[in-house]
Amino acid sequence: MPATTLPVSPISTLSTVELTLDRALLLQKFFNENPAYFLATSGEPAGPNEGAEEITSELPSGWSFTKKWVVGYANTDGSLAAMANVITDLMALSVFHIGTFIVATERHGGGDAQVLYQGLERWAASNGAAWMRLGVVQGNTRAERFWASQGYVAVRQRSGIQMGTRSVTVQNMVKPLMGGAIAGYFTLVPRDQPESESAP
């Protein structure tokens, strides 16, 4: 069944909002105040239109999916404490892809990222996800360690990807939510097999 409602925040002081284009400035402010993700991936702070682009950017032509969710985790004053971009049923039913997951720098080190991600994962599983998928820029050590600690395994790499001022290598990672073997995932998403040279 396609996801029709936002995930619920597992942190009681935060509430979730869908970040549509009318909230682009709110997302842009969050990006500007929390540049660490962008510095680690593209080598430069978020661009002036990054918030709107995060919300409106489209997938490559021909890629199947059900919905792109851009979710904000809002403080009581309305400002954002975290955000996640999740694409449901990407390239195959039951594959949910995390495009972006950022937690405010001031919340690092206290377990909030783990709690928020686990809530997102529960939401995905309750809406039919059997596999979670994402890409990590090699050298972004904090992200690499975080996703490995959440049970993700590396499946393939893509090199020569331009992100801002940098040419980077992206490591695709996958996590089974229902105990499936990785061979079953490759049947659903053959482009993620290690020898595949296709775009992600």
Residue ranges, per PLM feature:
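Acetyl-CoA-dependent GNAT
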Residues: 2-108, 117-119, 123, 160, ...
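Conserved GNAT acetyl-CoA-binding A-motif
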Residues: 124-135
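Conserved beta-strand-loop-alpha-helix junction that forms the acyl-donor binding cleft
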Residues: 134-144, 161-166
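Conserved acetyl-CoA-binding loop of GNAT-fold acetyltransferases
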Residues: 148-158
